[in-house]
């Protein structure tokens, strides 16, 4: 189980294995929408994401690539990783399908060949492999700002009602 699951379960490893899937379903959900529902694409957005810009512009970025991801808005940690599962996009094309299946399979097989070297953080650490293993990966961060309740305190609110979100 991930570090977060062990932490939330107060060190109970068996309980951690169970609760890890509570917040790590984006991979399976995305794969299911592409593979079983045959949707043109899937844009997964966590319910607790805060946007600095109108989130409807996310729709405009579908042509930027087959796989879209966002960076964490906290200082880099090897446990949490560079990217965040808060917003993930897959197009129903060769690269998008392969990547969503890869991500789902990593989560379902905790002994996969990447888990030890990359860590897991539920399903989040595998996002670091997307630009390495797949083509047409783009980052939304250059276009739309985002935060979540757990990262709000790490950012500066400026007098002109802007939020500094440089990292």
Model-based region annotation:
Residues 1, 67, 137-139:
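Conserved beta-strand scaffold positions in the cores of enzyme catalytic domains, especially
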Residues 1-38:
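Active-site-proximal specificity loops/subdomain of glycosyltransferases
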Residues 3-5, 49-51, 73-75, 93-96, ...:
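Short, solvent-exposed loop/turn segments at secondary-structure junctions
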Residues 5-12, 76-82, 150:
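Short, charged, surface-exposed secondary-structure boundary motifs
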Residues 17-18, 75-76, 161-166:
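Short, P/G- and charge-enriched loop/turn segments at secondary-structure junctions
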Residues 18-22, 91, 115-119:
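Conserved aromatic-histidine-acidic binding/catalytic patches
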Residues 23-77, 82, 88-93:
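GT-A fold catalytic core of metal-dependent nucleotide-sugar glycosyltransferases
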Residues 95-167:
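Catalytic core and acceptor-binding pocket of nucleotide-sugar-dependent glycosyltransferases
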